[in-house]
Amino acid sequence: MSSASIKKIIPCKKNQLIEMVLDIEKYPEFVPWCIEGKIYEKKNSEDLISFNGDLKVGKSILNETFSSYVSYHKETDKIIVTNLNGPLKHLKNEWHFKEINNNTQLEFFIDFELKNPILNGIMKKSFELGLNKIAKAFEVRAVQLYKQC
């Protein structure tokens, strides 16, 4: 398994960042290696927003689709992503949001394992570099959309 966490202060309001993270259909516009994002079966209740989502990731002819269950818990300002289908054997991804003076402290945690042991080994070697690149893409996107820096 590969796991990592990132903690950053992002120059936008908490609700703006949460909305951006939940909008996976826009990920291809800014997330490296993301080709397509789709949302299915979206539900919105008083305390929870949830949906099933697909992310197609890769480069040129090498790509995979990951299906996940995404839930945003309004009371705790936490987004939890778990694996439904695709090349992952295991996925736990959490986003925690805390507003601090019109900025948002974002804590991101991911733990995953691919079904293919060879690909799993390759991913472990480049995982941290890729994760940092993706985290930077979210930060840049937030600044572009909300310009509070």
Per-range role (PLM):
Residues 1-48, 102:
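Hydrophobic ligand-binding cavity/cleft-lining segments
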Residues 3-7, 50, 65-67, 90-92, ...:
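Intrinsic-disorder/low-complexity, polar/charged segments enriched in Ser/Thr/Lys/Arg/Asp/Glu/Gln
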Residues 8, 37-39, 66-72, 92-99:
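Hydrophobic/aromatic beta-strand elements that line small-molecule binding cavities or substrate pockets
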Residues 9-13, 56-58, 71-73, 98-100, ...:
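Solvent-exposed residues in well-ordered beta-strands and their adjoining turns
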Residues 17-21, 27, 70, 108, ...:
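Hydrophobic pocket/interface hotspot
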Residues 39-84, 137:
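Glycine-rich portal/gate segments that line the openings of hydrophobic small-molecule binding cavities
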Residues 82-129, 133:
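Beta-strand/loop substructures that line and gate deep hydrophobic ligand-binding cavities in soluble
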Residues 140-149:
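Short, highly charged C-terminal tails/helix-capping segments
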